[in-house]
C-alpha cells in the first residue's frame, strides 16, 4: 500500500514538473516571438526609410534649361544659368548648392550670396545687371526667381521644388573667367544630394555689338 502511494506521489510530482517545464517553454517561446516581431518591425521600417532615401537620391537633382551670357564686345562678363529640379525630385536647398565652373585655365567654386537675390515672378528683365542678383564678387553666385508657385525660394531660404525655375547669376569677370571668343566652358551646379545640372558650352567665334545677350547652352 505504501509502495503504491509512493509511486502515485512520484507520478504526481513528475506531472507537476512536466507542467512547469511546459509553461516555461511556452513563456520562452512567447518572449522569443515578441523579440522577433519587434526586430522584424524595426528592420521593415529601416528598409522602408532606406528605400525612400535611395529613391529620393536617384530621382532628385537639377537640370539645366539654358545658359545665357552678357558681353561687352570683347568678352562675356555675366552668365545666367537657368535651372529647375528634376521630375520627382525632392526639394533642393540652394544654400547648400555649389557651382563648379572653369574656362580651361581658371577653376572656381561658387556659393550663394543671400544679398544677391531678385524675384521676377511677376515680370522683369533677367539681363538687367542693376538687379541685386548681379551684385557679386568672386566666389559667389546670385539667384533670380522666375517661377515659384508656392513662394518657397526666398533670399535667406532659397528652396526650390517641382515646377520652380531660377536663374543662377555669375559675375564672370569678378570670378576671373576669361570668356573671350572660342572659349570652352564646363562645369556643374551641384546640389546637396541628387544629380548635378551640367554646364557645357563654347563661346561664339565673335561677339556682335548688336547682340549684347547671347544664348550659350
From Swiss-Prot:
Keywords: Archaeal flagellum. GO terms for cellular component: archaeal-type flagellum. The keyword Transport does not apply. This is Flagellin B2. It is found in: Archaeal flagellum. Its main location: other. It comes from the Archaea. Belongs to the archaeal flagellin family. It comes from Methanocaldococcus jannaschii (strain ATCC 43067 / DSM 2661 / JAL-1 / JCM 10045 / NBRC 100440) (Methanococcus jannaschii). GO terms for biological process: archaeal or bacterial-type flagellum-dependent cell motility. The keyword Lipoprotein does not apply. Flagellin is the subunit protein which polymerizes to form the filaments of archaeal flagella. One of its GO terms (molecular function) is structural molecule activity. Residues 1-12 form a propeptide.
Amino acid at each position: 500500500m505504501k509502495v503504491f502511494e509512493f509511486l502515485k506521489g512520484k507520478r504526481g510530482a513528475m506531472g507537476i514538473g512536466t507542467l512547469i517545464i511546459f509553461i516555461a517553454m511556452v513563456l520562452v517561446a512567447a518572449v522569443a516571438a515578441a523579440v522577433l516581431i519587434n526586430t522584424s518591425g524595426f528592420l521593415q521600417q529601416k528598409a522602408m526609410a532606406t528605400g525612400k532615401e535611395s529613391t529620393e537620391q536617384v530621382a532628385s537633382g537639377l537640370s539645366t534649361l539654358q545658359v545665357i551670357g552678357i558681353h561687352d564686345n570683347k568678352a562675356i562678363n555675366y552668365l545666367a544659368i537657368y535651372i529647375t529640379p528634376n521630375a520627382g525630385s525632392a526639394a533642393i536647398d540652394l544654400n547648400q548648392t555649389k557651382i563648379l565652373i572653369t574656362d580651361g585655365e581658371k577653376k572656381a567654386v561658387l556659393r550663394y550670396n543671400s544679398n544677391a537675390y531678385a524675384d521676377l515672378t511677376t515680370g522683369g528683365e533677367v539681363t538687367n545687371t542693376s538687379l541685386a542678383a548681379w551684385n557679386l564678387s568672386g566666389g559667389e553666385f546670385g539667384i533670380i526667381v522666375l517661377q515659384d508657385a508656392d513662394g518657397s525660394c526666398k533670399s535667406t531660404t532659397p528652396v526650390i521644388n517641382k515646377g520652380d525655375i531660377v536663374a543662377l547669376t555669375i559675375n564672370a569677370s569678378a570670378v576671373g573667367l576669361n570668356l573671350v571668343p572660342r572659349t570652352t566652358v564646363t562645369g556643374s551646379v551641384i546640389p546637396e544630394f541628387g544629380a548635378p545640372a551640367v554646364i557645357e558650352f563654347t563661346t561664339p567665334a565673335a561677339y556682335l555689338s548688336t547682340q549684347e545677350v547671347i544664348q550659350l547652352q
